[in-house]
């Protein structure tokens, strides 16, 4: 039994109910919108974030309709942000499959992302919980600011760990934090419990993103990420930052210049950074 199946066991029925509710958001009478929504739905991931939310709710109490609508809202927000991010990053792939903007075009992708974002607002309204609504609204602001920070860093090419941590805190960890906290809130957990859930979610999200960035330097059909893709797009992740800041080798100095000039290729990236992956793995522990 794989690790995700083990994690799902305590919430199997609840997760099935979530999936039904989530999938119900991806239908529309308009032909084009229905087609694109179906495409997005079929490319869906493992729903790790809703699992975290449901597990937190069950840990502190019961999974209710408030929990389910919260989980759907957060997963929809995550989905819409990925569609918009692919447009901004000009990415042709998402999870090893053609992105929405690649399969259709940027205009369609932006509008479908907006439609899903509006569906977030509809679903979170069904929680009738002001704290959850406010938390989700603030999360949307944080995700957008994180994407802008990453764009700014791509332009400025500042090779600094603190900026990297701030980007992944806003773009990834904030969503894990929200899932953990809102899961606890939906179960009427105490303020102290919600604070602990937030901290757990934040740390889990940071670890998740650092490990995901490591995968960028290895071929993997399972995760659908080409080797060195982030660096080729100008995104300076932790393996790159550490390598560039902790060596005097001429080869690495040349690599740094190519990164800033945007002339790096994936073979050069892989060869130069393999030795530094162990350092990054240690930072997740």
Question: What are these language model-derived features?
Answer:
Residues 1-285:
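All-alpha prenyltransferase/terpene-synthase fold signal
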